[in-house]
Swiss-Prot record:
One of its GO terms (molecular function) is RNA binding. Transmembrane segments: none annotated. Keywords: Cytoplasm, Methyltransferase, rRNA processing, S-adenosyl-L-methionine, Transferase. It is found in: Cytoplasm. The gene is rlmB. This is 23S rRNA (guanosine-2'-O-)-methyltransferase RlmB. Belongs to the class IV-like SAM-binding methyltransferase superfamily. RNA methyltransferase TrmH family. RlmB subfamily. It catalyses: guanosine(2251) in 23S rRNA + S-adenosyl-L-methionine = 2'-O-methylguanosine(2251) in 23S rRNA + S-adenosyl-L-homocysteine + H(+). It comes from Haemophilus ducreyi (strain 35000HP / ATCC 700724).
């Protein structure tokens, strides 16, 4: 069984992080692109098969998504779970985690992974149910972060949150528009897990109940909420700012 990824950034990042999982690459015949040429040279050096194909073939493989003239077939990555999370946390002091509850849009998942990687998050945690999977779309939007950022899928999110609190002493901060405390007046240092809910519905009830603290993002304009990936960036970089200013 194989998967595919597309886009120059996504394939380049995959080549840098997991070249052993690249099966073959399809590129647009006759395309001249200074960003593409170094990538093709490296693929040739590693003896990875590269096929020159026409645009219709690439369009069909990408199913209408923007592929930038390159698609790669890859071996799927092993799915990480609760046991991998515990192993990861044993080697971290003051970890920063991101929990996505009910984020089902692969574009949003990819954007959140990219933001999490930029903010130095140690792992992103999602439930197995009601969550986007790491599709080719998510990988492309993540611009390489999907290969670098551990994505942990857990069977029971509430139970995982309890274990983070009890076993690893991680403070769990949930975001909610109606929270009376905003993120800028909250103390967010130490070991932190930030929980972001789905757009519109927010966090599920049980997820909310397992948060140690709820915070909001102050909104000054006429819109009532932000896209989940934008809100994730706002919150993560406020946490980073506080950690750096300690």
């Amino acid at each position: 069984m194989s998967e595919q990824i597309y886009g120059i950034h996504a394939v380049n990042a995959f080549l840098a992080n997991a070249p052993e999982r690249l099966i073959e690459v399809f590129v647009l015949k006759g395309r001249e692109d200074k960003r593409l040429n170094p990538l093709l040279d490296e693929l040739q050096r590693l003896s990875i098969s590269v096929q020159q194909v026409n645009r219709q073939t690439l369009d069909n493989k990408a199913q209408g998504e923007v592929h930038q003239g390159i698609i790669a077939r890859i071996i799927p990555q092993k799915e990480l779970n609760e046991y991998d999370l515990n192993e990861l946390l044993q080697h971290k002091s003051n970890p920063l985690l991101l929990i996505l509850d009910g984020v089902t849009d692969p574009h949003n998942l990819g954007a959140c992974l990219r933001t999490a990687d930029a903010a130095g998050v140690d792992a992103v945690i999602v439930p197995k149910d009601k969550s986007a999977t790491l599709t080719a779309i998510a990988r492309k939007v993540a611009c390489g972060a999907a290969e670098a950022m551990p994505l942990i899928r857990v069977t029971n999110l509430a139970r995982t949150m309890r274990e983070l609190q009890d076993k690893h002493q991680i403070w769990i901060v949930g975001t909610a528009g109606e929270a009376t405390t905003d993120i800028y007046t909250s103390q967010l240092t130490g070991a932190i897990a930030l929980v972001m809910g789905a757009e519109g519905d927010g966090m599920r009830r049980l997820t909310r109940e397992h948060c140690d603290q709820l915070v909001s993002i102050p909104m000054a304009g006429s819109v009532s909420s932000l896209n989940v990936s934008v809100a994730t960036g706002v919150c993560l970089f406020e946490i980073v700012r506080q950690k750096l200013s300690r």
